[in-house]
Amino acid sequence: MRNISRKDFLKIGAALPLAMHSLSLRAEQGKKRPPKRIIFINSCLGFYKPYFYPKKRGDLSTSDYLKGMKTKEKMTVFQNLFHPGMETSNHDSEKSFLTGTPSPESPTFVNGMSLDQVLARQMGGDTRFPFLNFSIYDRGWGISWNDRGSAIPPMHDEQKIFQMLFEKEDLKAKKQQLQNDQNILDCLRRDLAQLRKQGANAGKLESYQAVIAELETQLNHEKFWLNTSKPKVPKSLSDDQEFVFSTKIRNLFELAKLAFRTDSTRVITLSMDWISGAIKVPGATGAWHTLSHHANKPNIIAQLSKIEIDTLKHFNRFLFEMDQIKDGEGTLLDHTTVVMGSNFGDASNHTCDFLPMIVAGGGYKHQTHTVLEKQTPLCNLYLELLHKHNIDVGSFGSSQKDMGLLNS
């Protein structure tokens, strides 16, 4: 386990069955203060640094990109974060955005467990969906990785996500699916027993047993929620076909907001992965990846900035609307930690230092803009987020210490 110690991993793993037992206490917990929630958003080609960071330290009104944010008092921009061991990782660095595992470009690379999954083990037991993973398009992986270092495929079809979250299921078909899953699980248990008889090595047995335990937990979780009605919400997705890329981002943010608002989940990832070919946003048409290699040419930067401004427009709207939803004595944003950033500090040169990172909401006393020491490990921030969500671990990835900057 590269990104978290074995001792800490076992401690976290123990929380998963405990979380399942806590389901019966859900109604009682609902009477207490609102639960904590968290979302991680990765824009895989980063943001043009001169426009992203404030020109005057601590003053977001001097950032070309962020000056229009409506919730500036509830966000902090962190400057000078990086992931060690990514000097030659290029686009592969996206795989390590939430793990901090070095050298993802290596043919022998094995990823660690991503931060969202560590949190989901602690936070996911009381909701229908322990976690949700979204992406712009379907390539089979995003920024979420399980404890075996395997990618957890994200969902990208907005209509199917809405259907999964809020539309009534065919109960008979669902029961049959769960029975089929149970049959598969029984077969796997028999296979495991046979492997034990054959004297398979301990490592193989442990891995096999871990898979079975994970599937069993998932199956029991689905059975628990089988007869519980899904929340009903009006369908508020955009069908604008002129700006498909922009519409997709807007809709995924909308789905994240609805999922949090209905307490369907408490952990979400959103991977803004780049699409080959031209995309169209208000004011610009071009290939996002090609434009990101701007070579400091003003005309190309002007086009690139339109794409990045459009992305941040939807981010701004998401934060503002979350902050308008009453949740306990505060707002939904106050009880949701929003982490937005990138695996690239400069996509034009494929560098992975000076990573742009925003933390918003969460009820923290935000500092608007914090300039850290150069080459501060991003995993220091991740470690602090784990601690803020009551997960007592000593380290995560390349972390050196808890930053101690997100005070409540």
Q: What spans do the regions from the language model cover?
A:
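Ligand-binding pockets and gating/stacking loops
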Residues: 1-408
